[in-house]
């Protein structure tokens, strides 16, 4: 069986899926709190930029992959309105349940679906916008997931990937210190789970950089791929169009 990485660890491909699932079962209940703490609230600005770039309009069909607690789903559902169709999906049952309950608490009624991004259960050319935020780096076969995202996107539609990326060189030393010392400490102090947040830091370092991900999206068949660096490259938003 082929090997892949789980953070800095080399594991069998089927083992990675189980390990990633374990991480997100563990962090689901504290996910929103930890996002605010770890990013000093900046994740809200990154998501707001993504929502603005998506430009979802009434009647749009939107697929939110690895949607977790539903921040993007909520905004997309409001923008698409009653004539639209917005799917809140995740491969992790715990994250999906937390997100679904959170959406319902806010009065957002939209379908939630347990979904593997490498095998998306929708027909070709179905969605106007497909998004994945902070989920691609956890996928075993990123190329397969990107190809699936393109497949279900309508001609003229867009695939959007919001993900941690490679920081600008002047920030690297401080960012490494924060990632490998502060993040696990925050995880231990506020979620009683240092290991999951150590994996977070390692998974970010193992994720392709901005230009590599751009090439991967092009190889998946997307056109006019571009990206925006946010917060000095801590995060990047990639956009590709299906022609």
From Swiss-Prot:
Q: What class of enzyme is it?
A: transferase
Keyword check for Transport, yes or no: no
Keywords, in A-Z order: Menaquinone biosynthesis, Methyltransferase, S-adenosyl-L-methionine, Transferase, Ubiquinone biosynthesis
Which biological pathway? Quinol/quinone metabolism; menaquinone biosynthesis; menaquinol from 1,4-dihydroxy-2-naphthoate: step 2/2; Cofactor biosynthesis; ubiquinone biosynthesis
Among PROSITE patterns, the record links this protein to: SAM_MT_UBIE, UBIE_1, UBIE_2
This enzyme's EC code(s) = 2.1.1.163, 2.1.1.201
Q: Give binding positions for S-adenosyl-L-methionine.
A: 69, 90, 116-117
Q: What top-level branch of life does the organism fall under?
A: Bacteria
Record GO terms (molecular function): 2-methoxy-6-polyprenyl-1,4-benzoquinol methyltransferase activity; demethylmenaquinone methyltransferase activity
Q: Which reaction does it catalyse?
A: a 2-demethylmenaquinol + S-adenosyl-L-methionine = a menaquinol + S-adenosyl-L-homocysteine + H(+); a 2-methoxy-6-(all-trans-polyprenyl)benzene-1,4-diol + S-adenosyl-L-methionine = a 5-methoxy-2-methyl-3-(all-trans-polyprenyl)benzene-1,4-diol + S-adenosyl-L-homocysteine + H(+)
Q: Name one GO biological process term.
A: menaquinone biosynthetic process
User: Which HAMAP family does the entry link to?
Assistant: MenG_UbiE_methyltr
Q: Which family, according to the similarity comment?
A: Belongs to the class I-like SAM-binding methyltransferase superfamily. MenG/UbiE family.
- Describe its function: Methyltransferase required for the conversion of demethylmenaquinol (DMKH2) to menaquinol (MKH2) and the conversion of 2-polyprenyl-6-methoxy-1,4-benzoquinol (DDMQH2) to 2-polyprenyl-3-methyl-6-methoxy-1,4-benzoquinol (DMQH2).
Q: What is this protein called?
A: Ubiquinone/menaquinone biosynthesis C-methyltransferase UbiE
